[in-house]
Amino acid sequence: MKKPLFLTLLCVLSLGLFAANNKKPSERELVSQNMPEIEAPTKKYKVLCFSKPYGFRHNSIEIGKTMMEVMAEKTGLFDVTFSEDLTEFAPDKIKQYDAICLNNNTHLQKGMKDEKMRETFINYVKNGGGIFAIHSATDGGWKEYVEMIGGNFDGHPWGAGGTWGIANEDPNHPVVKNVYKGENFTIKDEIYQYKDFDRTKNRVLMALDLSHEATGKKNGKRADKDYAVAWVKNYGEGRVFVSSLGHNKEIFYHPEILKMWAEGFRFVLGEVDVDTSSVPKPAAK
């Protein structure tokens, strides 16, 4: 073989190996790499992931579905059914699910207009169903829905392109104690402020850290400066977990957020019991 040809082939091979070694992982691979291990579940549950928005459609909906699929596979906690069809909320169908993931389904009230379907859904939760609400699942709803979720979207001064301070207000709580080892942190995402939010009816786990300079400079609407980011609650016999985080795609493969979400699912499915009693807002430092 002539030397120039040999060198050319060697260069091509080297470039191929370099490209292979530097290939960016897919979003699914990132979710899988960062999905935490959990305690072995006592059973396999059934979860509906409902992803139909009736307002703004987030481009993170698809990776939300990927996250659900990977969590189901890697933890063995549940089997998941994906749907954008409201017939899944019919009485004979909804009862088969142990919990429902509301995956960025903005303005659900605009789709679920039938009063009987609304009543069926709310009673499903009151009678023991679980709700795992991501980001814009808190945007809209009707009176009973907002009561069940715990708050209603009222703008987002903390935009998706910014990095904001998050206070872990309940660092010993099972759902968040392993997130950054219970410490405060910063994260890049869109953070909501809420109306119809009453801390005494929710167990706030995380909230905006207004002592963080960029976060504190934004003008929120609440006189009490209470901007919850994640909480748990009971609604009748049902269990509800809410995450304001979930606008940016990166949240769905963020290793620390996945820790919280995995434990949130264990709670809403009834795999573990956690304290949902309200705690006062910590005094500002």
For each predicted feature, which ranges?
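Nucleotide donor/acceptor-binding cores
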Residues: Y45
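Extracellular ligand-binding/catalytic regions of CAZymes and related secreted enzymes
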Residues: N22-T42, E62, E73-T75, H212-V229, ...
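Active-site rim elements
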Residues: G55, H135, G161-T163, Y180, ...
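Positively charged n-region of N-terminal signal peptides that target proteins for export
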Residues: M1-P4
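A glycine-rich, often tryptophan-bearing local segment used as a flexible ligand/cofactor-contacting loop or short
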Residues: T106-G182
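Bacterial N-terminal signal peptides
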Residues: T8-G16
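Catalytic beta-strand/loop cores that center a nucleophilic Ser/Cys/Thr
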Residues: R28-Q33, W158-G236
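Helical hinge/lid and interdomain linker segments adjacent to catalytic or ligand-binding clefts
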Residues: C49, F56-G140
